[in-house]
């Protein structure tokens, strides 16, 4: 609703794959709806446990315990990244996962695989 009240190039969206999913949205549909406002994207996967506890709640999650590709949101992440590539988006993607060295390595590997 916010975007309907303001016509400004300065009002932008920071999209988050995990928060869109947890809130009960289809992340790709949500991204497509607001693509023209997108300035930044957080790429976050979500564990099965968190999904069971919070899916459909009007909330966001600060970070995730699972690496990208290791949770239930992996397919949505793939679809969103593919859409961003198809639409020639050139903004910033931020990986969001709690930082064990292994989680970070797996997340970067997963995202690199999608970006080629």
What positions do the PLM features span?
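Histidine-acidic metal/acid-base catalytic patches
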Residues: 3-15, 20-116
């Amino acid at each position: 609703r916010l975007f309907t009240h303001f016509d400004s190039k300065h009002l932008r969206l920071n999209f988050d794959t995990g928060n869109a999913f947890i809130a009960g949205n289809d992340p790709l549909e949500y991204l497509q709806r607001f693509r023209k406002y997108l300035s930044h994207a957080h790429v976050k996967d979500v564990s099965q446990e968190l999904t069971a506890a919070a899916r459909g709640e009007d909330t966001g999650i600060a970070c995730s315990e699972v690496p990208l590709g290791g949770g239930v949101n992996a397919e949505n992440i793939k679809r969103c990244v593919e859409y961003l590539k198809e639409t020639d988006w050139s903004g910033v993607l931020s990986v969001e996962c709690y930082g064990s060295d292994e989680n970070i390595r797996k997340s970067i590997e997963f995202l690199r695989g999608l970006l080629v």
